Structures are given as C-alpha cells and as structure tokens.
A protein has these predicted regions:
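C-terminal functional module detector
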Residues: 1-14, 18, 170-175, 182-249
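A metal-dependent hydrolase metal-coordination microenvironment
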Residues: 2-120, 124, 129-141, 146-166, ...
Length: 249
C-alpha cells in the first residue's frame, strides 16, 4: 500500500491510497479449491490489500473472516440467461452479505439488483463467454468489463481487449479490471487491479470502483498521473513498452 498523486486539468493534486486488489475469487463455497481462510492467507502473504469474494450464486460472510490485514469485500458471480442461450457471468462487488437476488432471470435484472443493493457490476470474461461487444452493451448500468482474466487463459481467451476497445469506440466509458478469477493454485497472482482510493475503507474502495479510479495490470505500476494544458504525463515502473491510446487510435 502506497500513495499516488493524481492531478486533473484545473484541479489540485490529490494524494490517494493505492491498493492492490483481486476482485474475482472463488472458494469451496462454490467451485473453488481453497477455503476462504486459505485464500485470504495466500493473498495476504503476497502483499495484497483488498480481496473480493465472488462465489457463484452465493455470498460469503466476510465480516466473520480473519482478514489478515486486508480489506475484504462481499461479492457474488451471477449467471442469468443471456443472448443466444449463453448465460451471463456478472461480477458483483460490494453487495450486502444477505444479498437475495442470487438467481436473477435476466442480465439486466442482475445488474439492477446489484446497483440497488449498493454494489458495482462488471461483465466477467465476455470473450470466454462468447459475447460480442454489442451484446455486452445491452447491459445498462455495468461499470466495465474484465480486460484480463487468469482462469480463462487455458483456451487462450484471457484477454478481452478487442471487446473493451469496441465498447469504448461506441461511446461507453467502461472501465477495465484484471483479475485472477481464482479457482485453484495455478490461478494465483497473474492479474490484479490497483485501486486509487481515499482510504482502504469499503465505502471509499467502492466509490473508487464506481468512479474509475483504478487500473488493471499484470506488473507495471503508476506513480504519478497528470493532465494539464493538454499535456498528459505519467511516471511508472519499468515496462517493455508504453503506448498512449486515444479514441479510435
């Protein structure tokens, strides 16, 4: 956990807390290999700050778990009917532990229920599911998509960059997550989301997810971002290449 300086045009620089997060986690409460306490131990030992539990169609009582210094978020993965007979995989983060809409009939019902409960909804691994960008855009109210998902790499569909790019070109300001979607040990620590929040409290983390104050990564990290007088500046850790991508570029 560290600080980063964010400065937008015509505004003062703001110091935010940077939190390393895995936002897609399965346990033995659905189809995961590890118990909640085992998963917490793995991520705490690896230096993560935030862990969201998102078991299939069921929530976890995260308030009863030993967080081992991390912030734990209550979540769920929902699977309502989708286009062409393909079930949606909707990642919900920040919902109450007693969330009741565990078997929604439609994708829109799922997203609406998540938002009404105070959570944030994302389309999980749409490329792996087989959805097009146009189909993803029928879900009104999602915050974004998983742009990288570790557990779908086995069939070469871990990256969802094309779908994300097409939705952005269509005018949807979707944000992007990188997640492990951990089911077992081979899925650990391959993609994560760096959340820039006012604090490590659940409320501030969820506000950051709603507002897009985060970035997806598999390694490189930002230290400073600035946009002033039409000039974008960034300081970050060493990487193989850095490309600034604009609209339709």
């Amino acid at each position: 956990m560290r600080q980063v300086t964010i400065q937008q045009a015509d505004s003062k620089a703001e110091e935010l807390t940077v939190l390393k997060a895995n936002l897609h986690t399965h346990t033995t409460n659905s189809d995961g290999t590890f118990s909640p306490s085992e998963v917490i131990g793995f991520y705490a030992d690896a230096g993560y700050d935030v862990l969201a539990f998102t078991d299939h169609r069921t929530t976890n009582r995260v308030s009863e778990y030993d967080a081992e210094g991390m912030t734990l978020l209550s979540g769920i993965e929902l699977h309502p009917a989708g286009p062409r007979g393909i079930p949606w995989h909707i990642l919900a983060i920040g919902i109450p532990e007693n969330f009741s809409c565990t078997h929604p009939e439609s994708g829109q019902q799922a997203v609406d229920a998540v938002r009404q409960a105070g959570g944030v909804a994302f389309a999980a691994h749409p490329y792996w599911c087989g959805f097009t960008a146009a189909e993803v855009m029928t879900l009104n109210g999602i915050a974004g998509i998983e742009v990288y998902n570790t557990s779908t790499r086995y069939i070469g569909k871990e990256y969802n960059m094309t779908i994300w790019d097409e939705t952005l070109d269509a005018g949807r300001n979707y944000t992007a997550l990188a997640v492990d979607d951990v089911h077992g040990k081979p899925d650990l620590f391959r993609g994560w989301t760096m959340i820039c929040a006012k604090s490590r409290q659940c409320k501030d983390i969820l506000d950051a997810l709603r507002n897009g104050s985060f970035y997806a990564t598999q390694g490189p990290e930002f230290h400073r971002l600035s946009f002033h007088d039409g000039i974008f500046e960034a300081e970050f850790t060493p990487c193989a290449a850095a490309v600034l991508v604009g609209r339709q570029s």
